[in-house]
Design a protein with these regions (language model features):
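Ubiquitin-like/PB1-type beta-grasp interaction modules and other compact soluble beta-rich domains
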Residues: 1-72
Length: 74
């Protein structure tokens, strides 16, 4: 089962789980994904060992989608 997780102060929180053959679960995951993007989170998926890329559309076929805040500092 695929997961949508948000990196946060607790480490991470699972926001949704889905299987591509479960339309209701996919729709719930898409809604959670869009809500977090609207709050300013960035969505990342793994593209290989030690590599990831940012996504702006929900990747139904991904095993894990990680949401994180942009890096900030000064």
């Amino acid at each position: 089962m695929a997961r949508l997780i948000r990196m946060d102060r607790t480490g991470h929180s699972t926001l949704a789980e889905w299987r591509a053959d479960d339309p209701a679960a996919v729709e719930a995951a898409v809604e959670a994904f869009r809500r977090e993007l609207d709050l300013g989170y960035l969505a990342m998926v793994t593209t290989g060992p030690g590599k990831a890329e940012q996504v702006r559309e929900f990747p139904v076929d991904a095993d894990t989608v990680i949401l994180r805040r942009p890096i900030a500092g000064g």
